[in-house]
Curated annotation (Swiss-Prot):
Modified residues (Phosphotyrosine): 331
Keywords in alphabetical order: ATP-binding, cAMP, Cell membrane, Cell projection, Cilium, Cytoplasm, Cytoplasmic vesicle, Flagellum, Kinase, Lipoprotein, Membrane, Mitochondrion, Myristate, Nucleotide-binding, Nucleus, Phosphoprotein, Serine/threonine-protein kinase, Transferase
Domain AGC-kinase C-terminal span(s) in chain numbering: 299-351
Gene that encodes the chain: Prkaca
Post-translational changes noted in the entry: Asn-3 is deaminated to Asp in more than 25% of the proteins, giving rise to 2 major isoelectric variants, called CB and CA respectively (0.4 pH unit change). Deamidation proceeds via the so-called beta-aspartyl shift mechanism and yields either 'D-Asp-2' (major) or 'D-isoAsp-2' (minor), in addition to L-isomers. Deamidation occurs after the addition of myristate. The Asn-3 form reaches a significantly larger nuclear/cytoplasmic ratio than the 'Asp-2' form. Autophosphorylated. Phosphorylation is enhanced by vitamin K(2). Phosphorylated on threonine and serine residues. Phosphorylation on Thr-198 is required for full activity. Phosphorylated at Tyr-331 by activated receptor tyrosine kinases EGFR and PDGFR; this increases catalytic efficiency.
Activity regulation information from UniProt: Allosterically activated by various compounds, including ATP. Activated by cAMP; the nucleotide acts as a dynamic and allosteric activator by coupling the two lobes of apo PKA, enhancing the enzyme dynamics synchronously and priming it for catalysis.
Deamidated asparagine: residues bearing it: 3
Name this protein carries in UniProt: cAMP-dependent protein kinase catalytic subunit alpha
Family in the record: Belongs to the protein kinase superfamily. AGC Ser/Thr protein kinase family. cAMP subfamily.
Subunit structure: A number of inactive tetrameric holoenzymes are produced by the combination of homo- or heterodimers of the different regulatory subunits associated with two catalytic subunits. cAMP causes the dissociation of the inactive holoenzyme into a dimer of regulatory subunits bound to four cAMP and two free monomeric catalytic subunits. The cAMP-dependent protein kinase catalytic subunit binds PJA2. Both isoforms 1 and 2 forms activate cAMP-sensitive PKAI and PKAII holoenzymes by interacting with regulatory subunit (R) of PKA, PRKAR1A/PKR1 and PRKAR2A/PKR2, respectively.
Tissue: Ubiquitously expressed. Isoform 2 is round spermatid specific.
Top-tier EC class: transferase
Provenance organism: Rattus norvegicus
């Protein structure tokens, strides 16, 4: 690298440092003093279910006053308690209302009533990366790299705030109107200085240290990035089997096989991300994220232009207008029932 290039890289790294320091100030203000009850259910018309989960659903709604469309996540308090997800749910809302980054879905309102918790987020009409990946089969390396770069920047931001994301997978990445990523579902995100021990995540994406019940840190997100890049470029994940236990055996074995069409730079990056030895895993070494950003596979990536959303996306999802749901599957609709008596009030006081 010439002197000029090195100097440019150095000054870029300096301005990133300044940016992250300021971002942390903004985050901490909201983290320490979270917003509460910023809307109510009758402010919205409910249109259609976009997805369902074990303790709730996500619905497309329209804000009556502004006419804006949003995605409303509705969580049944009793089910959250039964499934021991109180902590995770409180975490999700507290984190979402405090973060601010171009590739993180924005929480616009949150509130609760006798039965449910509600998080109202910006609606991302392009649907999940998962459905586009399955339809197309696999993404070309430049296409995969465009998305990967956004995740790298997002993790750099989150990790600088001591947040671990812990749930990277194509189902949690939505594609917006401009073809950029919006990371959604902060149900497993956690603010951790040092290490944590909770077993959570999706089998194919779990880092070996989580499976082996070791204390782990944000390096688990860099492992998951390796799994995601592999799955985007191959069309299937690096470790898969019928039963979770068989997947776990493959993950901890440290053996990965690559399709023959992977470029040598891609294979090299993945060997360094899907690295069982934490003292060698990229993202976890003394240069931190810069080992990843400066890797040859990302040589053509203009990180600042990606952050500013100035790079032309390789794929723009088709959609017919603000409330279009054609990029989402259909689900059976269910009435939202609200009890006349308060359920689980004290568990969720801080929501």
């Amino acid at each position: 690298m010439g002197n000029a290039a090195a100097a440019k890289k150095g000054s870029e790294q300096e301005s990133v440092k300044e940016f992250l320091a300021k971002a942390k100030e903004d985050f901490l203000k909201k983290w320490e003093d979270p917003s509460q009850n910023t809307a109510q259910l009758d402010h919205f018309d409910r249109i259609k279910t976009l997805g369902t989960g074990s303790f709730g659903r996500v619905m497309l709604v329209k804000h009556k006053e502004s006419g804006n469309h949003y995605a409303m996540k509705i969580l049944d308090k009793q089910k959250v308690v039964k499934l021991k997800q109180i902590e995770h749910t409180l975490n999700e809302k507290r984190i979402l209302q405090a973060v601010n980054f171009p590739f993180l879905v924005k929480l616009e309102f949150s509130f609760k009533d006798n039965s449910n918790l509600y998080m109202v987020m910006e609606y991302v009409p392009g649907g999940e990366m998962f459905s586009h990946l399955r339809r197309i089969g696999r993404f070309s390396e430049p296409h995969a790299r465009f998305y990967a770069a956004q995740i790298v920047l997002t993790f750099e931001y989150l990790h600088s705030l001591d947040l671990i994301y812990r749930d990277l997978k194509p189902e949690n990445l939505l594609i917006d109107q401009q073809g950029y990523i919006q990371v959604t579902d902060f149900g497993f995100a956690k603010r951790v200085k040092g290490r944590t021990w909770t077993l959570c995540g999706t089998p194919e994406y779990l880092a070996p240290e989580i499976i082996l019940s070791k204390g782990y840190n944000k390096a688990v997100d860099w492992w998951a990035l390796g799994v995601l890049i592999y799955e985007m470029a191959a069309g299937y994940p690096p470790f898969f089997a019928d039963q979770p236990i068989q997947i776990y055996e493959k993950i901890v074995s440290g053996k990965v096989r690559f399709p023959s069409h992977f470029s040598s730079d891609l294979k090299d990056l993945l060997r360094n991300l899907l690295q069982v030895d934490l003292t060698k895993r990229f993202g976890n070494l003394k240069n931190g994220v810069n080992d990843i950003k400066n890797h040859k596979w990302f040589a053509t990536t203009d990180w600042i232009a990606i952050y500013q959303r100035k790079v032309e996306a390789p794929f723009i999802p088709k959609f017919k207008g603000p409330g279009d749901t054609s990029n989402f599957d259909d689900y059976e609709e269910e009435e939202i029932r609200v009890s006349i008596n308060e359920k689980c009030g004290k568990e969720f006081t801080e929501f």
